[in-house]
Every structure is written in C-alpha cells, then in structure tokens.
Amino acid sequence: MKSGVISQHSHSTLLTPNSEYMSIITKKKGTLEYLTAEGITVPHGFTTRYGGVSVGTQYSLNLAFGRGDTMENVEENLRRLGAAVGFDPEKLVMTRQIHSDIVRVVTDGDCAGFCHRDYPECDALVTNTPGVTLLVFTADCTPLLLHDPVTGAVGAAHAGWRGTALGIGVKTVEAMVKNFGCKRSNIHAAIGPNIAQCHFETDGDVPAAMVEAYGPEAERYVERRGEKYYLDLKAINALALRRAGVRNIEISDACTYCQCDRFWSHRASRGERGSQGAVICCKEVCR
C-alpha cells in the first residue's frame, strides 16, 4: 500500500465458489476517494466525486471531457487520480462509449496523453502492455474491471443495460482469452458502483432483453412494481461473468442514485453531471 493511502472496508458481495471472502475497499489519499477490489492486485479503482478541482455540476473529481468542464480541470483531476492510484496519466487509453458490445485491444501506441485524440467508439478495452492504463466512464451504468494475474492482462468495460444485454462483460473476457491466452478461471473481476435495483426503474423492454440474453435465471434479478420493473444489473453482469467461467467476482453494494452526493447519477441529476471512472493499469508480471 502506498504511503498516505488510508484503507477502510465497506460492504460488498463476492460470488466466488471455493474462494475466500474478499471485499471492496474505500481508499483515500488526501481528499481523493476511490474504491478498490482486494482480488485485483494491479493499480485500479472506481472513482467517487471527491478529490478533484472541478466546480458546479462537475464538482469535484469529474473525469469526462465534453460535459461543460474545462480541459485544464479534467487533466488536473486525472493527474491527481494517477498519483493516488499509481499510474501515468499520459499512458491512459479512454473510451468513446456508445452502449455497444465493442471491445478494443489496445497497446501503448493508443496512448496519446489524456484525451487529445478521437478514440474509436467502443464500450470496453483490453491490454497486456505494461504501463497502459484503461479508463471507462459511468454515471449510473455498471463499470467492470478484469485482471488476470498470470498473464498480466487487464480489461475495463462500461455496461449500460444495452451493453449488459449484449454481453459486454463476457465479450471482454473472451477478448482477453483470445488475444492474451488468459484462462477464464484465473481472471478476477470487480463490479463497481451503479444505479442499484432500488432505483433502476424501466419499462418491460429492458427485463425482456435480459431474459432473452440470459434465460429465465435473469428473472431472479427483476422486480415488478405495478407497470414498472426494477433490475439488478450488478447481479445480471455477475451471472454473465460466472457463465463465462470467471470464478472470482467482487461486487460493490454502492448505489449511485442513493449516494448521488458521493457518485454522479445521470437519473438523480437529470443529466446535469460529471462522470466518474473505472481505471485499471497493466503491470509486468514477475516470473
């Protein structure tokens, strides 16, 4: 653990047959706060709103360009995050998210220093290039981080309900297996804060898409209240990852809507918001 970083355990769920309990941890460096998973041993984190320099509706650790914040503020926020988590912000690769099932394989040739380039559209990134750091953005959608400690490969995915129905998490695992020779059973996954079932209200098309994708078992994670439906997208993504052969899955219990003072929530803010991120850095494996 880095000097100056304070750890505090928070509630989490772990879906890991034949594995010891691990938990999501809150870490702080100064005022900057982020969450990490015990099972992922490379620098990574799910950010909160705390610890940056942005103001107004982007207060304070906004990581997204193009939402009304200044480029200087976002760059400083990324520098602060890099210093806290332990990665070089000049070696970030980011996403231009479109609620798809597109996974990009990236190397250090895709790094361009913050966001000074147009990244291709995708909703997940994978790499096995040491030093490269992956970043996806959320503000209610479900962030997924993946790490194979044997090959060193990492992945990050943004799973909205459409991406969840399309299997973005599974396709990220498959990209790691295909491109880097990962074994599914070696991969550790962490599912970060999202809008929880208590507030994720939908019409019938959303649960129908989940049942079509994952069968009747998905109905366990759907609650009907009158004419509306409430879904647990963390549990559905965990179901998908388990079926893909991932055994070690840690799940944050944080709800972005319930804790909209701590996380950005698109629904709670009616779109007036910044974005938090899920970040993971590839490190060289010691042989």
Sequence positions of predicted segments:
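Active-site microenvironment for binding and transforming phosphate-containing groups
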Residues: 18-287
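Short, basic, low-complexity termini and linkers enriched in Ser/Thr/Gly/Pro
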Residues: 1-19, 287
